[in-house]
Amino acid sequence: MNQELSTNPFNPVAPVKTFDEIKISLASPERILSWSYGEIKKPETINYRTFKPERDGLFCARIFGPIKDYECLCGKYKRMKYRGVVCEKCGVEVTLQKVRRERMGHIELAAPVAHIWFLKSLPSRIGLMLDMTLRDLERILYFENYVVIEPGLTDLTYGQLMTEEEFLDAQDQYGADAFTANIGAEAIREMLSAIDLEQTAETLREELKEATGELKPKKIIKRLKIVESFLESGNRPEWMILTVLPVIPPELRPLVPLDGGRFATSDLNDLYRRVINRNNRLKRLIELRAPDIIVRNEKRMLQEAVDALFDNGRRGRVITGTNKRPLKSLSDMLKGKQGRFRQNLLGKRVDFSGRSVIVTGPELKLHQCGLPKKMALELFKPFIYSRLEAKGLSSTVKQAKKLVEKERPEVWDILDEVIREHPVLLNRAPTLHRLGIQAFEPILIEGKAIQLHPLVCSAFNADFDGDQMAVHVPLSLEAQLEARVLMMSTNNVLSPANGAPIIVPSQDMVLGLYYTTMERRGMKGEGMAFSSVEEVEHALAAGEVHLHATITARIKQIDEEGNEVVKRYQTTPGRLRLGNLLPLNAKAPFELVNRLLRKKDVQNVIDTVYRYCGQKESVIFCDQIMGMGFREAFKAGISFGKDDMLIPDTKWPIVNEVRDQVKEFEQQYMDGLITQGEKYNKVVDAWSKCSDKVAGEMMAEISAVRYDDAGAEKEPNSVYMMSHSGARGSPAQMKQLGGMRGLMAKPNGEIIETPIISNFKEGLTVLEYFNSTHGARKGLADTALKTANSGYLTRRLVDVAQDCIVRTHDCGTENAITASAAVNEGEVVSPLAERVLGRVAAEDILVPGSDEVIVARGELIDERRADLVDQANVASVRIRSPLTCEAEEGVCAMCYGRDLARGTLVNIGEAVGIIAAQSIGEPGTQLTMRTFHIGGIAQGGQQSFLEASQEGRIEFRNPNLLENANGEQIVMGRNMQLAIIDEAGQERATHKLTYGAKVHVKDGQTVKRATRLFEWDPYTLPIIAEKAGVARFVDLVSGISVREDTDEATGMTQKIVSDWRSTPKGGDLKPEIIIMNPETGDPMRNEAGNPISYPMSVEAILSVEDGQTVRAGDVVARIPREGARTKDITGGLPRVAELFEARRPKDHAIIAENDGYVRFGKDYKNKRRITIEPVDDTLNSVEYMVPKGKHIPVQEGDFVQKGDYIMDGNPAPHDILRILGVEALANYMIDEVQEVYRLQGVKINDKHIEVIVRQMLQKYEILDSGETTLLKGEHVDKAELDEVNQKAMDHGMRPAHAEPILLGITKASLQTRSFISAASFQETTRVLTEASVQGKRDKLVGLKENVIVGRLIPAGTGGATSRVKKIAHDRDQKVIDTRRAEAESAAALAAPTDEVIDLGSEDSGLVETVENREE
């Protein structure tokens, strides 16, 4: 807990100052003077001839201390024995030169000056205190207007502004003494010091009770907050105006002589000099009684000089130095990436480090790295010196140095000793996740490059094309221990992001293993039988059997009981070799490798070995298969030439067929049968299908099995082997080499209609080449942007989650979330077993339909239990989650579940927040940057139908169907679902049916897999007539609300609803189509008895004419999907950022807040009013305003359920939280984020997203303050809220009422309780201004604060030590308290009086000296 500030140089044995928290507040003039060692009167710095500091200047030795250790300026006193003497000649105290880093000075200002932070940092604190606008304040401060401070008996008002003329007139009118008005900072200072804070707070509270309206209470609350914070912190408002200016120690703004008699100086000296010059001039002018106007001008200049010193450029012109460069002010020293916080406090350069290029080291073990001798010698120098001395080879450091410089042979022997079992850390920038720094044991090598083990490359994301890596030496024993136990590469087999092995073979190794495990027909030695592995090896060496021949052989295995048995397998020599490397374990049988191994399979094998055979075995196994992979790939001699790229013969027939199709589409377009947009979509569709087809043909050709004349199977195509094994190259790349390149996208994401038909083997035509430059250039630009964006996202995530640490074992909460399989478009993308793995069950999990418990409550679900859950067909499981954890600080281990990188329950002290942030941010660079627009996806066609993914029985939910004239079933409802139920009655899939879809199956029908269930129009959203009748147009006026589009190419016209609000006459129109009864001429009515009318939205295409007869199920109008677009797919990184920043989408969906019936109210000018009348009478009806012309999918009288969309679009996460609660929000966030990553094939565990969402939900917004001190609309932490409410309840007062709110990650980081952490993140000046006004205390609980003040972080081993210290401290405290109580009771007995006796009762504290075990 306790931290040394610095050792006292004068008294090293004095106890060091310790602290537990840091407080920031305003400094009063007295406080500034108490820091100061003297006033600085002159702007001079140092004498240019003698280089000695000038007296009373900015570097004055008398004020700040001596230049040399223990030596005064004139040289009269030298050496230690005069320590503490003040020289009578030059006035310098004889002491350490170091005091020049800590002694401060001050400048007495001739006129008060406003502190720019409190003036200009919005909202202006001075302005809020005085209830004045910033503009008025500046007018007073910069001497444009007078302000009335004391109106007296005149009819002026307090705080009124007057110009010079008005002021003089008023003086003439009322007399000079009748009222007080003033100008400049003095006036503001007088007003601030006159404020009675308690009185003001009272008045404001009274006003707040009576205030009505929207803005007034907000304004009052703002002022009340600041008044209260001044009251609580003990600051005075007038301290925001400076009368004394502190001067920072000279060593912190150094003046350095350069060669050639010039000086380099810190900008601060320039800024201070300007202030001193102007201040001195002002003093002189006041003494000389100069005219007012001159003095004022000088005061204004002084104010500007001080402003520039504190925050240059915040107000007025930026003050520049000699070379037109803006001067760096005090604020700039703190701000930004180059500021104090991020440059020097959060990251520092360290010694004992080096960097060099990396090369591969395939003969290393997994825990080793090759370190060049020269580097090791330099890095381990002090260790070598001490060993040399210990061995008696050198008596002094100087001698040792000489030996090392000469590189004598004994030095190398000693280096070997020193380096033995001393791990070093290797780091590759960018360190995107914790696996970017790992520990290895160094092996000395010749040469100058670091050797890296090939298996750890994927963790470092390293390759050997010139990458560099840095080496760091952990010095202390503790550091070495942590490096070995926590950071050793052998201890980091699993990835913390998803729990899968990250130490996996890649490239050559995969290819080698693939080749080894191949099986080919008709090879030499096929059908032979062998008795043991050794015999097979023998036969291979003798050339009697081929690596790929099918043979029968015996191999040792372990059965279920754990006995060694010998089993026979049909296999190949290659697979047998691999099986021989497997650790003997019942759970890792030979079947594991008795198959063709691709990259995924190899990862699976490693995972299985790690889970069941332990870490040591798996590390040895990894090393062995790496060696084998390299060896076999080398022996196989796989390589390819241009002839291995096959172009299928069927390519041109396919292409020509599609060309004809495209011609046909063009013709249809010319004839006006389809619109240009439809033509574009169809053409793009056709070409993308063609390109896929050609690729398919090519893959079929290239993967075909071929035989030689003897009937033996030939080796497969080399390119195919590389791609199929997962070593290098993807089908997409092969398609470009041997198929056709396909469609290209323009830089804005649109797709060019003409595809590139050639492939790289044939070569591109000039035109095709030109078309392809688009994509290539965009790719490069994207990559550069992506890296920066991804890094910034990671930084924000880390900042919001940095104080989320596992603090307790179990918080005992009853809350939980429900996990079920993730289904996307009716396809299970992540099964339930995968989602609950490594979580703690919140309730007993039962076999459906029985009482058999699979997993008991509070048990960790491991692989075995997850399999049981899967086999039992459980639909959903209640699991503990960080979201619902109720731990006081951080989260508890039970809610978090398994530590993915270790495979066991998470340890207390694990920094799960940072791990979550890294896991989400690290794959960021793999995500795409672009926002897709529907109508341009280079991957091809729009899906327009859905097939059954499983067999089962169809069940309709909330059916609402209509049969049209052709006998087709059309969906008319908005919340109809279609479910597929299996034999056991378990729901296997549910699909939401869109309005206007055609359903091909009946309720209760049994379907096979791939039966077409329903289809819809992917390009437009239809509006369908419910009943037969005559269509009647209302307010569809040609030229105002309808435009006729004539297609130039085809001459066809379409009637399209245009935006009628933009026309002058169209303000009140409500364009709609009504279905009339042809007999009566009245509108037809629906079941609810309302007239059937269809309001038209902008851009709708009318499909009927006025007065045309329509049948039930006919399409009245079509809305293009672009207009009522299902959603604009923001893809990739921007989507993830949008979700975590909790931004409201542009056209966000409107969600029904409760169950009820839809009513359309009276319309506004260009908004429509929708009201929901709740079923439950106790609730109020809710109104929504929807812009006219937006498509509203609900009708008058429709019943909606809580959480239904009244308007389509992306839902705003805030609404989901408010209406449906935390769990629904969690599910939404997890699904949306996972969808983005899933598209890229990145696996991230859900719990990481939950941790981040938990951090976004920390704050509560006060809805009703009750009788507490909290204010309506204020954001407070849950802990704070509970504390205040508890206090209120104890006193019998009404508690405050609040609801959780969702903050975006940037907002949440800036609102954290620690001001140090917030200031080091963003908007440094604003955070510090706010914190100092409130007198905030930083309790140093998060990681960042502790790093900044230079302590161990309170996580991991640092957390353990601080916990032990706390226990010890508490125990000591108990003993002290008991002793004190004893002493007091003894004193009380000696002098018996009535009051004191009951102190003795506290004696019971003595018993509990053994610390509480829970700590």
Swiss-Prot record:
Signal peptide location: none
Binding locations of Zn(2+) 2: C811, C885, C892, C895
Gene Ontology BP annotations: DNA-templated transcription
GO cellular component terms, A-Z: DNA-directed RNA polymerase complex
Cofactor(s) demanded: Mg(2+); Zn(2+)
Keyword annotations of the record: DNA-directed RNA polymerase, Magnesium, Metal-binding, Nucleotidyltransferase, Transcription, Transferase, Zinc
Pfam families given in the database record: RNA_pol_Rpb1_1, RNA_pol_Rpb1_2, RNA_pol_Rpb1_3, RNA_pol_Rpb1_4, RNA_pol_Rpb1_5
Enzyme class at the top of the EC tree: transferase
Gene3D superfamilies: 1.10.132.30, 1.10.150.390, 1.10.1790.20, 1.10.40.90, 2.40.40.20, 2.40.50.100, RNA polymerase II, clamp domain, RNA polymerase Rpb1, domain 3
Function: DNA-dependent RNA polymerase catalyzes the transcription of DNA into RNA using the four ribonucleoside triphosphates as substrates.
PANTHER family: DNA-DIRECTED RNA POLYMERASE (PTHR19376), DNA-DIRECTED RNA POLYMERASE SUBUNIT BETA (PTHR19376:SF54)
Oligomeric and partner information: The RNAP catalytic core consists of 2 alpha, 1 beta, 1 beta' and 1 omega subunit. When a sigma factor is associated with the core the holoenzyme is formed, which can initiate transcription.
Stated name of the protein: DNA-directed RNA polymerase subunit beta'
Protein's organism: Cereibacter sphaeroides (strain ATCC 17029 / ATH 2.4.9)
UniProt gene name: rpoC1
